[in-house]
């Protein structure tokens, strides 16, 4: 505990925050218009892929009087799928500039442009007989997802009081999963996943963006952004009054003032400066491990293998899409369960339990895939493994990193940290999508042993390095990491912040 100077008033006890209507509605508006987009567009092209390929082929035939060969079709479809994470990588690199210049809420509002324009283009692509519009739109939608995947957790984490930060923060992943699930439902052949309905299926991505444009302007900007980066304590106080539903906010304001003083001392960190700074070494490594572990632990491989596992268990190909919807229900239920438990059990317990379940499921699934031809009954165990893996990933590795990555950085470094975090997320997403088919072809079922090993290593890192952040302020978490980084934080001076935004040295003002 730090020694206080003589005459320093005792710390102001914080008042436990409650989920006020303004905070709830702001969370729903922000998450539905942003995270939902990510999940919906991640999944919407998967089930009806044969319908899209047929449109590509018909369009090509009308232009060239011949159908595409297999290699060209594979190339075009690979571009359709893989352009989304590449666009996400670009969006993650843009987000740092946007969140500082336009604010967290302003960034989310501007980002809707990258959803509405592609929705229109994809909606008219059939009439225009231009499959290129779909490929281009997937890139732009990736940019939208890349921006929202970083800006949304930042906004929600800065809106919520510390005792609700975990639950509110997991809403990012909850709405991603809801987006995935509704895309699975709408893309069923009986609904919109057919030759007549697919333009509407793709254009629906514009609806959440329009709803966010109509609702989010009525909710406050992040009070931490207003006070720490804009120096506007009056606006921050007004926002807190609306978000908390009471006027007893001095403890929270003082915590923000402490962060503001830290930002004035450090300046606004660039990505390069962040990577070189000893005082943030373990925080930076932690978000890299969390985001890489999330993608490299096998979730995309499980999805890739799922239909094969269902078929081997006797599920007809025409019915496998409904089993996929069932796995989506498990995904939603367990992600919501995580949101309920994260403030009771803490972040570490959910992460460790999730990786433990995922690693165990991967090991058992390896055995199932190797021996199911000899023992047909094992194929049913394969379905259980898929559902168990999805449940494990949904309770920890999927939702909790969105909370932790906001909590372990102060305002001065959060922008740069989220750029690194987003880049790792999208790069590993792309790498797995690109390399897994080759790995699977080379070693088959043994590929899941690799994923089990990654789950184990990630869990060990979490157990050894990442502290429990439940119920702690950003400043308190920063002090915990300062001890691990073996740096001494400067004594906080009792001073009020000046009006106006904090200044930074020229070397620290750029995004990179």
Curated annotation (Swiss-Prot):
PROSITE patterns referenced in this protein's UniProt entry, alphabetically: MFS, SUGAR_TRANSPORT_1, SUGAR_TRANSPORT_2
Cytoplasmic topological domain: 1-21, 100-107, 160-172, 220-281, 343-350, 401-415, 467-512
Extracellular side: 43-78, 129-138, 194-198, 303-321, 372-379, 437-445
A GO biological process held by the record: dehydroascorbic acid transport
Family listed: Belongs to the major facilitator superfamily. Sugar transporter (TC 2.A.1.1) family. Glucose transporter subfamily.
Keyword Protein biosynthesis: no
InterPro entries: GLUT, MFS_dom, MFS_sugar_transport-like, MFS_trans_sf, Sugar/inositol_transpt, Sugar_transporter_CS
Residues carrying covalently attached carbohydrate according to the record: 57
GO CC, one annotated term: apical plasma membrane
Tagged with keyword Transport: yes
Tissue specificity remark: Expressed in small intestine and colon. Weakly expressed in testis and prostate.
Membrane topology classification: Multi-pass membrane protein
Name of the molecule in the record: Solute carrier family 2, facilitated glucose transporter member 7
Organism the protein comes from: Homo sapiens (Human)
Annotated catalysed reactions: D-glucose(out) = D-glucose(in); D-fructose(out) = D-fructose(in)
The encoding gene: SLC2A7
């Amino acid at each position: 505990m730090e020694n206080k100077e003589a005459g320093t008033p005792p710390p102001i006890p914080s008042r436990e925050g409650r989920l006020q209507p303004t905070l709830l509605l702001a969370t729903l508006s922000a998450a539905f218009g942003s995270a939902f987009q990510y999940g919906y567009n991640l999944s919407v092209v998967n089930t009806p892929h044969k319908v899209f390929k047929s449109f590509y082929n018909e369009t090509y035939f009308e232009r060239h009087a011949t159908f595409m060969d297999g290699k060209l079709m594979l190339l075009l479809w690979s571009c359709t799928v893989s352009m989304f994470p590449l666009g996400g990588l670009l969006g993650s690199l843009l987000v740092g500039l946007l969140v500082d210049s336009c604010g967290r809420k302003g960034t989310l509002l501007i980002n809707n442009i990258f959803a509405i324009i592609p929705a229109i283009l994809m909606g008219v692509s059939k009439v225009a007989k231009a499959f290129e519009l779909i490929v281009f739109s997937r890139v732009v939608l990736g940019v939208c997802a890349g921006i929202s995947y970083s800006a949304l957790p930042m906004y929600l984490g800065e809106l919520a009081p510390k005792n609700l930060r975990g639950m509110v923060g997991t809403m990012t992943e909850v709405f991603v999963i809801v987006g995935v699930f509704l895309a699975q439902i709408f893309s069923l052949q009986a609904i919109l996943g057919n030759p007549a309905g697919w333009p509407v299926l793709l254009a629906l991505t514009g609806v959440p963006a329009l709803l966010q444009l109509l609702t989010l302007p009525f909710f406050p900007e992040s009070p931490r952004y207003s006070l720490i980066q804009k120096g506007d304590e009056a606006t921050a106080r007004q926002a807190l009054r609306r978000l908390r539903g009471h006027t007893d906010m001095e403890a929270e304001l003082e915590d923000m003032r402490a962060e503001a003083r830290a930002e004035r001392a450090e300046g606004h960190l660039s990505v390069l400066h962040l990577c070189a700074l000893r005082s943030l070494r373990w925080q930076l490594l932690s978000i890299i491990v969390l985001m890489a572990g999330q993608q490299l632990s096998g979730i995309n491989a499980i999805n890739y293998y799922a239909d094969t596992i269902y078929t081997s268990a006797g599920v007809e190909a025409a019915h496998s899409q409904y089993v996929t919807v069932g796995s989506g229900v498990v995904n939603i239920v367990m992600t919501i369960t995580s949101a309920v438990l994260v403030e009771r059990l803490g972040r570490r317990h959910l992460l460790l339990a999730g990786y433990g379940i995922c690693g165990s499921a991967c090991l058992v699934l390896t055995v199932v895939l190797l021996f199911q031809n000899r023992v047909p009954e094992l194929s049913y165990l394969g379905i259980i493994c898929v559902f168990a893996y999805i449940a494990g990933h949904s309770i920890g590795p999927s939702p909790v990193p969105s909370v932790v990555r906001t909590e372990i950085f102060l305002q001065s470094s959060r922008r740069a940290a989220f750029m690194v975090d987003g880049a790792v997320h999208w790069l590993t997403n792309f790498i797995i999508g690109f390399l897994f088919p080759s790995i699977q072809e080379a070693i088959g079922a043994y590929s899941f042993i690799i994923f089990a090993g990654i789950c184990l290593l990630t869990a060990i890192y979490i157990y050894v390095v990442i502290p429990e952040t439940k119920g702690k302020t950003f400043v308190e978490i920063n002090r915990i990491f300062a001890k691990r980084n073996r740096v001494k934080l400067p004594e906080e001076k009792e001073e009020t912040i000046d009006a106006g935004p904090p200044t930074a040295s020229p070397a620290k003002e750029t995004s990179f």
